[in-house]
Amino acid sequence: MPPSAGLATESLPAATCPAKKDAYAAAASPESETKLAAGDERAPLVRTTRISTTTIKLYRLTIFVRIAIFVLFFKWRITYAARAISSTDAGGIGMSKAATFWTASIAGELWFAFMWVLDQLPKTMPVRRAVDVTALNDDTLLPAMDVFVTTADPDKEPPLATANTVLSILAAGYPAGKVTCYVSDDAGAEVTRGAVVEAARFAALWVPFCRKHGVEPRNPEAYFNGGEGGGGGGKARVVARGSYKGRAWPELVRDRRRVRREYEEMRLRIDALQAADARRRRCGAADDHAGVVQVLIDSAGSAPQLGVADGSKLIDLASVDVRLPALVYVCREKRRGRAHHRKAGAMNALLRASAVLSNAPFILNLDCDHYVNNSQALRAGICFMIERRGGGAEDAGDVAFVQFPQRFDGVDPGDRYANHNRVFFDCTELGLDGLQGPIYVGTGCLFRRVALYGVDPPRWRSPGGGVAADPAKFGESAPFLASVRAEQSHSRDDGDAIAEASALVSCAYEDGTAWGRDVGWVYGTVTEDVATGFCMHRRGWRSAYYAAAPDAFRGTAPINLADRLHQVLRWAAGSLEIFFSRNNALLAGGRRRLHPLQRAAYLNTTVYPFTSLFLMAYCLFPAIPLIAGGGGWNAAPTPTYVAFLAALMVTLAAVAVLETRWSGIALGEWWRNEQFWMVSATSAYLAAVAQVALKVATGKEISFKLTSKHLASSATPVAGKDRQYAELYAVRWTALMAPTAAALAVNVASMAAAGGGGRWWWWDAPSAAAAAAAALPVAFNVWVVVHLYPFALGLMGRRSKAVRPILFLFAVVAYLAVRFLCLLLQFHTA
């Protein structure tokens, strides 16, 4: 590939490196960005827009008020501990048991408060970014970019989805001569390689068609089959209305019909590859195969290459640039008995192979099911990496990566299991953008290559310092070491370069080096993304968050309850692995380079599964005495306790409302996130704690289940919602569901038992204290059941519409049964 317009990334002049090195690098403020562009005739590429100052001030005030209430509450709890224990003992529980119960409850409440503070404080300084991609219309200003696409199992990640992702990348609105797409096939599956080859052939027609008519999105599956209300989320809107850019409407209709016919034929060929060999004819096996590096499309030149006017290409391509970005298939070597480090190992292999083939200064990371939905997404990401100065471009310096939010097709309209996760992306990540930047979350992320090499940002380097290509750190490959020292991209697709790339993806290359520790993606955890981003922030790098409109990238998400819980289990286990590693946010270095609130955010990200231990106890233990008829809740709550409880609930609601106001998420999305948090905490988080405890005790590695991917548009709305969302209604029992099912059953039975024993009739209580003592336990049961309602829907499958009457009937039957047992006991004891 051609040089990146003189864009230097590995070393900067001493004048650009501030001398001050006594603090972390916080995100640029609106004022600083304005000063950054002073003297430039053009507007800055990135602007920071302020979120409503009044809303943010109220949000911060409410958070600190709630923290103050926490402090007063715990002071009161500890001061009056003896009185609480004595009161409980008077209700029928022994002194030692009461003390144990009180201590456990205080520990749980302290943990919940601590986690809430860790979650809220990093979100108190949110900023919102806007980019001006039109300022980069001059293609000579754009640097080269490598795009990494990873797939690991053709059974769970359809090769057709990988092919569509590749096609969307090749058709993106970025100079063809400056993009190289690398596809990592970690299973060595012949069907995956065949699908990528088919995509390379079809790209010769698809990419010029997209350029000619300016269609969006440039994923053919979503474009042709993702109509309004379909699995593609209505993203094929350009065909019917909107931003049509072609010469004439009839010409678009004719060309579209021809291109669609070719796409359907390609799709049939890929399906035939899968049907022809159910065992996925592989180059060996998934964990034992040779390395392969194959250039499928050579790098394009810098000069436009116009198509022909005749029908040899099915459509008229006169005056259309038909050049294609380079496409490389990579299958790293894997041997039994050697650690391959899952996705992190595959990404590091791509990082080395791409260095000797293209060496672009920037790298975009996409999962195989995440396609480019907005053709300007690549340019938008580059806006954060470079600055316009005069008539050229300079490196933006300390931005290590740009994280785009994950958006999904094919999710049920109600988003029962919070797949969109808007609270995390549009609230937490947006809030972190005002500190050192968002957390890296695995896909839809644009990296600076030099940051992946473990290099400090410019402000923390010595004047004139660059990258020290140490063989003990990077390995012994001379071409790769030369690429590390290089300041510009290059294009090498000759035999020697391919042979060198093949050697760089061998399983033995990393032996005795710093790969996976100080270089590249971090090993030792199944959530290598969080650990890798943390290492960059710890060195002083910043990151940026950008939510494009339309969405930059879109993917698929598991809408089946079992698949979703296994996905959450993998994330939770990976977070705990980071906590027990050298990358522990509490103990790791970088004190001056890492913002304290950024450290708090990473600590929250790695310890949240421990919440399950306390939450499960709260869901079960208070309800069991009610079922047994004991007096664990007989002690009447004091007015002070009720006042604290009311204050905490009111401030929690106020924080939620203000949070939705400044982040733009809906209250319904916030509530669904709360519900699924409860479901996850009583199931997947518990399993993650058990798995990691076993790993810490025995050293046994954690095995995880790869999340199944699917084409969102494979079931069209014509087939009806039952078929379109068939996975949502499929009931697949897994052991992860057992604790949550137990918590749900215990709390429903507790409600029935309380009613059967007459504890619901608080209006008949002799005093207000007695009424509160009767009402609070049942209110807590209702709180648990309401949070677990999506889980109950998942257990009902296609009968989920009847879950309300079924739960009601279950409660009535349980009430009558308990009431009957109470009468029998009274009769026999009379």
From Swiss-Prot:
The chain crosses the membrane at residues 61-81, 98-118, 613-633, 638-658, 676-696, 735-755, 776-796, 805-825. The keyword DNA damage does not apply. Keywords: Cell wall biogenesis/degradation, Coiled coil, Glycosyltransferase, Golgi apparatus, Membrane, Transferase, Transmembrane, Transmembrane helix. Substrate binds at D367, D369. SUPFAM superfamilies: Nucleotide-diphospho-sugar transferases. Expressed in mature pollen. It is found in: Golgi apparatus membrane. The active site is at D186, D529. It comes from the Eukaryota. Residues 251-279 form a coiled coil. One of its GO terms (biological process) is cell wall organization. One of its GO terms (molecular function) is cellulose synthase (UDP-forming) activity. Its EC number is 2.4.1.-. One of its GO terms (cellular component) is plasma membrane. It is a multi-pass membrane protein. May catalyze both beta-1,3 and beta-1,4 glycosidic linkage on beta-D-glucan. Essential for (1,3;1,4)-beta-D-glucans synthesis in grasses and cereals (Poaceae). The mixed-linked glucans (which are not present in walls of dicotyledons or most other monocotyledonous plants) are particularly important constituents of the walls of the starchy endosperm and aleurone cells of cereal grains such as oats, wheat, rice and barley. They can account for up to 70% by weight of the wall. Belongs to the glycosyltransferase 2 family. Plant cellulose synthase-like F subfamily. PANTHER family: X-BOX TRANSCRIPTION FACTOR-RELATED (PTHR13301). This is Probable mixed-linked glucan synthase 7. It comes from Oryza sativa subsp. japonica.
